[in-house]
């Protein structure tokens, strides 16, 4: 999934194709960008994906060079996510996002600038769906809080957590 420091002009120039039930950008053969608001069925498991987040340092960056406004998820992407989740009865095995829902963000940081629209959208998804585990990045730490795992340097298999 995308984060908040991607070159979205480049990322969005790749062809959109269908893969495992959802939409992806094919960056190279075998290298896929799992697009926002998609449900993928992989090896008998369902994954919901929703990338993006606001950059807290964007005032130091230059638009189109080191910062892109497309880092912030749109209402259309949110609506597509809801539509796709409804098709799966709001039930998935795993969620993969860049940032996290508000209640998780509050446990990880006291920085209110991290409470961006993506966080709010994820909180709405969180209220509607059932899932086994939620994986996210953005906070540059490896930690598990209940069934939410922040990943930075660790790599874990689905259903894995940080000890």
Regions found by a protein language model. Give the residues of each.
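Long, contiguous hydrophobic alpha-helical segments, chiefly transmembrane helices and signal peptides
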Residues: 1-2, 33-34, 47-54, 95-100, ...
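Active-site environment of divalent metal-dependent phosphoester hydrolases
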Residues: 4-10, 40, 55-58, 101-105, ...
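Amphipathic, positively biased hydrophobic alpha-helical segments used for protein targeting
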Residues: 14-18, 55, 62-63, 148
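C-terminal capping/extension of enzyme domains
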Residues: 47, 135-163
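Short glycine/proline-enriched coil/turn segments at helix->beta-strand junctions
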Residues: 16, 43-45, 90-91, 130, ...
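Core catalytic region of metal-dependent phosphoesterases/phosphodiesterases
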Residues: 1-41, 110-111, 115-122, 127-128, ...
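Active-site-proximal loop/helix segment associated with metal-binding centers of metalloenzymes
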Residues: 22-29, 38, 42-112
């Amino acid at each position: 999934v995308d984060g908040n420091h991607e070159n979205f002009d480049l990322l969005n120039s790749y062809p959109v194709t269908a893969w495992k039930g959802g939409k992806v950008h094919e960056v190279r053969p075998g290298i896929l960008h799992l697009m926002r608001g998609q449900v993928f069925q992989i090896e008998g498991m369902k994954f919901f994906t929703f990338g993006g987040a606001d950059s807290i340092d964007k005032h130091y960056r230059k638009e189109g060079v080191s910062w892109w406004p497309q880092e912030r998820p749109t209402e259309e992407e949110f609506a597509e996510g809801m539509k796709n989740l409804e098709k799966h009865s709001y039930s998935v095995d795993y969620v993969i996002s860049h940032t996290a829902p508000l209640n998780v963000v509050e446990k990880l940081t006291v920085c209110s600038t991290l409470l961006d629209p993506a966080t709010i959208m994820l909180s709405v998804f969180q209220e509607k769906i059932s899932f086994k585990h939620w994986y996210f990045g953005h906070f540059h730490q490896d930690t598990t809080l209940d069934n939410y795992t922040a990943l930075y340097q660790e790599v874990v298999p689905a259903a894995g957590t940080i000890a």
